[in-house]
């Protein structure tokens, strides 16, 4: 496996499709073993010292039955140690629950492959591939601004949902990702709660720095997140931002032509992505610029425009969110550099970090609350470049 001149491993040489197929084989093997579990247990318990079926079963080191043991992958959890509790969030393809794993508070992302007839075979294959890719990316990451990955399971028995009437067994085709539980919830929800009163400038810069450091780390690991938005950022109890949801992340190709396709969320997507052009990690930098504006303003970009209007305006008219006049010039400069239409003119995330660190937050500069905005033209219904 060769590296490009910039040290980035080519995605086409890593072959994520092969990785997904490899994980699929592990899943198939696990399901086969599950089906044969009863037969294996009967075979092992029937073997006894002296050849009598009624004798004590053969043991090793006094520890248990002789039999086949499935060797777990390094990222696989033990389903028997997982308790799934209340729902935290619901999405198109699954739910996020609060839970306990091996005595630790966790968040559990559940995906149902949909073998019950609700989805087509192609959709199921796509979901499995997304799940495998997310696990492959996430389990190797270790940074204070990235949500800690604990483990996952791709279709296993033993999962139980705790209800008021007692434990409820989950279907065997349910797959899950287990990560640390972050009580602060999504950054987006935090911003919505502060939409009227806004955030102090010190908090704005702290949140932005957390996100910038997390993205800088991902890029140092040759990972492009591709869906950077405040909804995918979580807060711990100390209000530290941690990046989550690696469902569309992938290893960056040294050749941008190897990375194409409209991936991301409207309002945060870079022009080159919206236009279907090749892109690289700089698409994350663009999305960070939009997030930075959102953190400062506690508002949504382009709330009154449709998908087609945003796509056309961002690509053809250089549409960007209005920067309030009360925004300190140093922070506004970071926004403008990050969302530059030319990816080559955007800074690297490891450059953005010191830019934010150098901003003086001791003299205020936060967004003016809604009831004090007479002297600050903070928003217009029609946003321009």
Curated annotation (Swiss-Prot):
ATP binds at residues 88-96, 109. It is an enzyme of class 2 (transferase). Keywords: ATP-binding, Cytoplasm, Kinase, Nucleotide-binding, Phosphoprotein, Serine/threonine-protein kinase, Transferase, Tyrosine-protein kinase. Its main location: cytoplasm. It catalyses: L-seryl-[protein] + ATP = O-phospho-L-seryl-[protein] + ADP + H(+); L-threonyl-[protein] + ATP = O-phospho-L-threonyl-[protein] + ADP + H(+). Autophosphorylated. Phosphorylated by HT1 in response to low CO(2) concentrations. It is found in: Cytoplasm, Cytosol. Expressed in guard cells. GO terms for molecular function: ATP binding; protein serine/threonine kinase activity; protein serine/threonine/tyrosine kinase activity; protein tyrosine kinase activity. GO terms for cellular component: cytoplasm; cytosol; plasma membrane; plasmodesma; plastid. Changing residue 245 to N: Lost kinase activity and impaired autophosphorylation. InterPro entries: Kinase-like_dom_sf, Prot_kinase_dom, Ser-Thr/Tyr_kinase_cat_dom, Ser/Thr_kinase_AS, Ser/Thr_Kinases-Pseudokinases. Serine/threonine protein kinase that phosphorylates proteins on serine and threonine residues. Collectively with CBC1, acts as a negative regulator of stomatal opening, probably via the inhibition of plasma membrane-type ATPases (AHA1 and AHA2) activity in guard cells, but in an abscisic acid (ABA)-independent manner. However, at low concentrations of CO(2), together with CBC1, stimulates stomatal opening via the inhibition of S-type anion channels in response to blue light (BL) and red light (RL), thus being a key component to maximize photosynthesis in the light under low CO(2) conditions. This is Serine/threonine-protein kinase 52.
